[in-house]
Amino acid sequence: MIGFYSYTVILTYLGLASAALGMMLTFNGFARYALFCLAFSGLCDMFDGKVARTKANRTEDEKRFGIQIDSLCDVVCFGAFPMILCYSMGMRGIAGICILVFYLTAGVIRLAFFNVMEERRQDETDEARKYYQGLPITSISIILPLFCTLRPLLGHRFLSELHICILTVGLLFIINFQLKKP
């Protein structure tokens, strides 16, 4: 079998499975429950790197595989899945579709940029990163569920505000600023 198999990728794959389940829930009209899957995927992503770094004697190939598999799973979990969720919530007009495609594209650009910069950084140092460059794509796993809790307060404005929220998040993925890691 190709790939690298150890406990270091379990949380990454668990987050991916949660996103897959969330997409199925969304397709079947259960977007509210799918939001829990999105949040759970974010929780898994928060700790997968910490778990991976606990393995002693990781090879360079294992490290590079970890960076790539994490970002590929992030495209699904925090790019495609939220796009599908927002589409199911009503972002279906021309403006909504353009915003969703922009959001996904910005997320992919952000992840590809991260991969290049992280591999370079790891070649130069073993120190942990202290800052994010741009808004991490995982942030949607907090932003979207919290935003959806405002639905009763926003009433008929919810959909227009959702458009603004997703557009803003997509822009923050690719705007160059530093955000201190927690």
Question: Where are the predicted features?
Answer:
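Lipid-exposed faces of alpha-helical membrane segments in multi-pass integral membrane proteins
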Residues: 11-17, 37-40, 76-79, 98-105, ...
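Helix-coil boundary and interhelical linker segments in multi-pass alpha-helical membrane proteins
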Residues: 21-36, 76, 80-101, 146-162
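Transmembrane alpha-helical segments that form the membrane-embedded catalytic/substrate-channel core
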Residues: 45, 104-117, 167-181
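Cytosolic, membrane-interface loops and tails of multi-pass inner-membrane proteins
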Residues: 47-63, 113-130
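C-terminal membrane-associated helical module and adjoining short loops/tails
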Residues: 122-182
